[in-house]
Each structure stands twice: as C-alpha cells, then as structure tokens.
Amino acid sequence: MANLRKTHPLIKIMNDALVDLPAPSNISVWWNFGSLLGLCLITQILTGLFLAMHYTSDISTAFSSVAHICRDVNYGWLIRNLHANGASFFFICMYLHVARGLYYGSYAYKETWNIGVILLLLVMMTAFVGYVLPWGQMSFWGATVITNLLSAVPYVGDALVQWIWGGFSVDNATLTRFFAFHFILPFIVAAAVILHLLFLHETGSNNPMGLNSDTDKVYFHPYFSYKDILGFIVMLLALITLALFSPNLLGDPENFTPANPLVTPPHIKPEWYFLFAYAILRSIPNKLGGVLALLFSILVLMIVPILHTSKMQTLTFRPFSQFLFWVLVADMLILTWIGGMPVELPFIIIGQIASILYFTLFLLLIPMAGLMENKMLSLK
C-alpha cells in the first residue's frame, strides 16, 4: 500500500513542504528566521484571539478593559505581555530575515522577495493599528500624528484623513475600525505567507555560498525540522523571559496614562521597531517629502533586485560589499536611536546624515561596489 503521507491530497502538500522538501545541506542559522516568523505569527494570532475575547473597542472602556485583562482575567497579564512583547520579537526576526536576504542575495528570487516586502508592510500596518487599541496617551497621539501624515497627499489629503478617522479627529469610530483592521490583517498576513512559501518552493532555498545546490540536497526532516525546533526553544525562552521579568522594558511609560486629547505628551514616538522609519520621516522638513521618504525607506527593498550589479549572488566572497552591508546595519541602528530622541541639535543633523546615507547605500554605493568587484574579478 502506498504511503498516505505521499498520496493524500492535503497531507501530500504538507509533506512536500515540511518532510521531503529538498534543502541545501549547508544553510546556516540565518535560515532559521523564516520558521521563527511563522511561530511568531501563530503565537500572536493565538494570544490576540484570547485578548480579543475580553477587550472592548470603545473609547470609554478600552483602557479599563486592558487593565481588567491584566488584573482579573486568568493569566490575562501573561497573555497581554506575551502579545505585546511578541510583536517586538516578530520585528526582530523580520529585520534579521530581511538582512539575511540582503546579505546572501535571496532577493534574486524576485516573486518571493516582493511578497516578502508586502508582508513587511502588512505586519507594520497591523502593529500600528494594534498599538492604538489600549487607548493610552501614546496610542492616541501616535495614531493622530501618523494618520495626519495622509493629509500631505495632494488634493484628496484632508478628505482621506477624515475618511480614515471617521470624523474630524481620532475618536470612537477610529478605535472601532482600528480594532477591526487589527483583527483581520493577521489573517491576510497568513494568506500572504502561504504565497511567500509557494513561490519559495518553486525555486528552492538559497544557500550561504550562493551556488547551485542541486548536487547536495538533504531532506528537510529530520535535519532542518530539528534545527527549527531548537530555534523555537531559544526564541520562546527569550520571549517568556522578557514577558515575565521585564514586560514593560520596550513599551512607553506614557501609555499607562489614559488617552487625553487635551494633553500632548512631550515626546511623541512610535514603538522601537518603527523608530528608524520615523527618523527618516522627521529628517525632511517638508511634510509630503517626509511621507514619501518614509514610504520609500521600505519600498527601496523592492528595487534591490534591479540594482544587483555583481556577478556573484551573495556577499560571502565580496569584502567591499560586506563592509557596506555592515555600514547599512550601523546606519539603521543610528536611525533607530535618533528616532527616539527629541527634535533638537545635534540629533537633527545626525538624523539627516543617517537618512541620506541610508538611501545612498541602497541606490548608489552597494551597486557601485558590485561593479568594482566585477572589475577586480576580471583582472589578470
């Protein structure tokens, strides 16, 4: 009798993706982040589901309902802390996953890469609307500031902002629709993840050498299934440690104050994982220019495959491009730091220099380094 695992229409799909999948034998720990992101998504959907059972999306009760979850619901404090800090881990894994893609030239698989960039945007949207739900000071003012950016759109800007708000300011209608968006978006993300995997399995995984690995493949199970489980254990341990020992480390103290439209916090800033983009937004004195720079800071990833000039796929054997990659990493960290600082000297100028460098690296320096390395390869 034929093996059910290989013949059943549904189980066969799972088998081809998780058991008999041919994987390059040399993929390193940097290839663990895809499965870790899957784990993050499942964790967030489950904890979010239990939070949604007790949360009320009304401005008069939203803040109290979050307090009620933490005080009165069985293990509500744990579910809430896991959900809030799970978002941080989601973004850490996502940024590392993107960095891996940039370093090892995984953007050569254009469909997989572009769906990945769309996924990044979807998750950022989900996190933004989710941050508004507790209805604390930073929730309210963050929502006000970021949604207000849409007023920079020529001609239709003001109408667009009022349409999203459902009125003339961030109010009850805004909170209700943001809760609806926050509930539906993770399922759209899950659908996009399936597409992401579908396109990935058309080509197979890249590997650290950037060479064709058809001659040296191993089964996904048991080799990489166990490797992924090790990653799961490490990440869950880190997440649980953060959620139990220092759950508010990455949050903003302002959000412990209920939203008040009459009192503006001294420093309005988003969660830490958006600070680099926020720094780019703030470094341009013009509103529309800032919004475009903010958008392009993520969308620039879409044109990375077009700007690939090197004869080699990965940076493994390209020291100049490697140096520029690490400059980009340092630049992102500087932008993250600047995004959390007040708008005053010397932070303004540092942010502007870091923003210019960010785009120059992507659009000019890294492609030029690729051309230079090609030249050096052809030297006799």
Swiss-Prot record:
Binding site residues for a ubiquinone: H201
Localization, UniProt: Mitochondrion inner membrane
Membrane topology annotation: Multi-pass membrane protein
UniProt binding sites for heme b b562: H83, H182
Cofactor(s) listed in the protein's UniProt record: heme b
Signal peptide region: none
Main location: mitochondrion
Record keywords: Electron transport, Heme, Iron, Membrane, Metal-binding, Mitochondrion, Mitochondrion inner membrane, Respiratory chain, Transmembrane, Transmembrane helix, Transport, Ubiquinone
Binding site for heme b b566: H97, H196
BP GO terms, sorted: mitochondrial electron transport, ubiquinol to cytochrome c
Subunit composition and interactions: The cytochrome bc1 complex contains 3 respiratory subunits (MT-CYB, CYC1 and UQCRFS1), 2 core proteins (UQCRC1 and UQCRC2) and probably 6 low-molecular weight proteins.
Described purpose of this protein according to its UniProt entry: Component of the ubiquinol-cytochrome c reductase complex (complex III or cytochrome b-c1 complex) that is part of the mitochondrial respiratory chain. The b-c1 complex mediates electron transfer from ubiquinol to cytochrome c. Contributes to the generation of a proton gradient across the mitochondrial membrane that is then used for ATP synthesis.
Name of the protein in its database record: Cytochrome b
Species for this entry: Arapaima gigas
